[in-house]
From Swiss-Prot:
GO biological process: L-leucine biosynthetic process
Record organism: Campylobacter jejuni subsp. jejuni serotype O:23/36 (strain 81-176)
Protein family membership: Belongs to the alpha-IPM synthase/homocitrate synthase family. LeuA type 1 subfamily.
Enzyme class name: transferase
Protein name: 2-isopropylmalate synthase
Keyword Manganese: yes
E.C. code: 2.3.3.13
Assembly behavior: Homodimer.
Gene3D superfamilies associated with the record: 1.10.238.260, 3.30.160.270, Aldolase class I (3.20.20.70)
UniProt-listed CDD domains: DRE_TIM_IPMS
Amino acid sequence: MKDNKIIIFDTTLRDGEQALGSSLGINQKLQIALALENLGVDVIEAGFPVSSQGDFKAVQKIASKVKNSTICALSRALDKDIDMAYEALKVAKHFRIHTFIATSTLHMQDKLKKDFDEILSMAKRAIIRARSYTDDVEFSCEDAGRTPIDNLCFMVENAIKAGAKTINIPDTVGYTLPSEFANIIKILFNKVPNIDKAIISVHCHNDLGVATGNSLSAILQGARQIECTINGLGERAGNCALEEVVMAIKTRKDYLKGFYTDIKCENIFKTSKLVSAITNESIPSHKAIVGSNAFSHSSGIHQDGVLKNRQTYEIISPSAIGIHENRMLMTARSGRAMIKTCLENLGYDENTYNLDDVYERFLRLADKKGQVYDYDLEALMFLSYENEEENEFVIEKLSVISGNIPTACVCMRIKEELKTEACTGNGPVEAVFNCIARITNLKPALKAYSINAKSSGVDAQGQVDVDLEFKGRKFHGKGISTDVIEASAQAFVSAYNAIYRSLKVEERKMA
């Protein structure tokens, strides 16, 4: 291994899972582990085998299935933990035992009730026992960020002497700042005589929002392994996010000269979405690299710049992480250049329309809707102002019966005619969707469905967003209500009306 390769140690399945309200199932963990392997992660920390029988079985199954990544299990500096970790890992092609003990004065005195000499002795014994099972042993000085530096240096020196091949320096509570954390790593390299015999790793938490910054600062001082999680999942405020540190290394090669990872960056986005779906942890829209707004532009000035040269406002190409769709949002802040480009993409020559007229109508629509989609813009070309938001379909009544066979009854107004249908489904939302499809005689495919709370309390409003695909085109719908079924119905009908308007546009184009 070259000195400038940064080893990516992913702990989504161990530290990341600790942040979840409930444990993941064995097959869910395996699905994530296989995705991490496909992403190119070097080391996957699969769990803490001694913590539960379920975790033991999950680590064991992952160890038997993953072949290209080293599988790691966590253990305290206790014989039973280390033995259990080995039993879970021994079927793996490549495995690592990761043992740890707290080294800060606060943790030693108040949590462990031991002095430094006792902690040092426990650490050495644990490493020696782990080495009896494998040469690949990692040792962590828990709460290293608040450990007296002389104690930390002495602990690291003795851990390496005992046989640890990787020494992890965690900022367990996210207390240190980048320059401070960098200095800790620098001092270790200057004062620990056998530091060259081990790989120095860092594990940074995000309590002060600097986990990625701390990790990058450590690389510059000699750290060669970064412990991180997908989407920054982890205890409290989370961990260093894999996608952030990897893309920082890739993007800032001018500053982080020579450093690289083996991560297949084009798989980052789909791995992020998979972990989000399995853990039921939504990704904040403003999350760096993988948030829905990370590559979105709504300001007219920004959009104009991106249309001329993407690098004016994008330091990373969306395709670099596996995003291949346009994230230019049409809102009331969009300028004429954006509208003109969108119309060109829809196939309209600028000589066939009056841009000022279309833009004026666009602004009126954007003020009403917030976000305008390409099919809305196309409707402006063919429908009168009064019909731009014409709703062919309106829900008049809605009732749902839950139970063994969820059933919905929907009454809709189509022009002046009322139509009623009752349908079943796997759940009440699907039953409503089936009713609307039958009444409208349109059969789009549901591609995305999401719920977000718009307020708190028992009377909280929920917003439902749906994406329907019809004839190869996606249509968005939104609904808001204190009743999630009603909000879902509103969202479906909103999307169906968009489909209706697009069909009407096609008729006008053919006329």
